């Protein structure tokens, strides 16, 4: 049985074909008057039929195979302007066809034209080429960034531009080379062929020949087009990357952070007599959508069966009435380093007030007091481990300045003979090795006479498509699904090892997906109404937290920065109130900021400039005063 068309689709079809045929007829009029020498009835009819068919067929082919526009003939899925856009596209394609036909039939010819003012001509050409290159770069880079880094935010982009972003994976760099860099080069070269040409265009239909496009006209048109392209490219980039939010970040001020900030330095914190170890595992891009639908996820088949079993033994703060949920992305927390800043400081990572605000080891949130600072003061040994380079995104600065951690990254492993001299896989070395190195380091820490705080971050589930270990099988069609399935199993295996160790009795394990995945291809068919949230799990917290009522773990609205007071509570730290930074202890009965004020409102306020943040978190006044006194 054939499904009948909706009224909107039926009207859309008529309008679509009407506009396509109209464009073809207009082209045929130009063809007859400008290119057809003998205007007989048969030649005119042939021109109309040819131009309508060729222009529409070429346009449809490009839309389908090059532009890959989905559901071309399902008009209910397109805007009302869709037929008019098609009309303009057919006209453009048809004009190119007519121009080529004019050249082939000798109606249009080219002739060398020597410019009268060579210096001026070259200036026009160079500026035209420069503007064209910049416009191509703006458009292609915006498209690449939006497609490669799903959910890329302006604050992330600006912070990374202001800081050290070394250590990027080769796969990401390859997509950049094959995408915006190559495309920009091709567009610029093609534009230069037009702009730098010294030939004028001549037109001759019968006996008389005259110039229709002089060399000067070419140069002026090239300049005009390049300026138009540049303006359009900038506008496209601003819209595509939501760069208007940067205006908000710098120009609109909000006192929200100051009004809701509980200063860790002024809070009376009491640690238990026997201080508890803390292990914090950041699982790269691990989110609850990987669970099966009946568990709260989006998958037909559960991609995280081992983490599901672990989660039933621990404590998961879910946004759902039942099933596994968590926290959504929040302002200033949507990429790895920002997520870590949120969880360890109870604050978002905001757009820097000036260049290099995140740029050096002694200038990374100098006014913030983090979990590492607090635990260092309490005599904890602290180690952070990841298979990537600590230089990436400022990780080294964060952990060196705030807690003086032992940093075991790819460089440490390389310099200490833990990996071969020329070994570099994915972002550094793969998670299989990371877990083995982590076991050795945890064993060392446990044998010391101090409590320890161990932090690690995985990388094999990073976009694009993740990294699949040589030891892994591939039961799923999508590469990313295989990477997720193997990675969660290895994470669970590592946690089971920790649970088998003597030190586990006095150890709390906190596991977080650092942020939502940025893998574009894997999520392209997701229902936009499905709410994606980050995975979270706390194992073996102190009894006071373990005995929290069931309603603390469901229907929760919370942010990444709520993890700081929650982690402190999980290891038995008593503190005044239930807040540290702007975060709230999730084990307590105090509503989070998201619950009290609403998620959208809080995120909007955090996007705005905070003078308090700029003057107290990005600056450490105690050091400035001390320096002045020394001087």
Regions of interest found by a model, annotated:
Residues 5-247:
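Transmembrane and membrane-interface helices of multi-pass
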